[in-house]
Amino acid sequence: MSVSPLPITAVNHIALTTPDLDRLADFYERVFGAEVLARAEGEPRKFFIKLTAGTSLHVFERADAAKAAAASAFDCGSINHFALEAREPETFVAIRNELIAQRRVSETVYDAPGVYTLFATDPDGLLIELLVPQRSGWTPPFATEQFVPLGEPASPGP
């Protein structure tokens, strides 16, 4: 069946497991200003972290989260990373600075087609990409590197 355009309106949520629910909530609240919603203290403890209107992380606490994820990767899939888009360049810079302060990010910012992007990790080691659309008249207040997608050769230097 071929349907065009894709009949999906948005990503509603991404489900994650963590061995420390409170630590993960603190990280997303502090770094991204995310709102923690609908805490449930039963077994397993869980909550939603609101990222944008209609998009959230659904996080479940599981003491053996890393071990269980590795053991069941082929049963339930895995995730390499997810990307969050900053609304404004100033927000991108502020989040980058907080990630640097927490030592959760490579300080490298990439100049990719149409966006500036960086990669960081959350307290459980999940890779997060943060990007901001390139805008006329705004230049990042730090050096950037040209982004080279995996599998493509880097262009020769000057």
Q: What residue spans do the PLM features occupy?
A:
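Alpha-helical elements of the RecA-like P-loop NTPase motor core of helicases
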Residues: 25-26, 93, 128-129
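A short, acidic/glycine-rich surface segment
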Residues: 64-70, 106, 138
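Core segments of cupin and vicinal oxygen chelate
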Residues: 6, 16-64
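Short beta-strand/turn micro-motifs at beta-sheet edges
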Residues: 1-4, 67-72
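Vicinal oxygen chelate
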Residues: 2-7, 10-19, 47-51, 70-158, ...
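Hydrophobic pocket/interface hotspot
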Residues: 24, 28, 82, 99
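Short, flexible, mixed-charge acidic loops at enzyme active sites
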Residues: 63, 71-74, 143-145
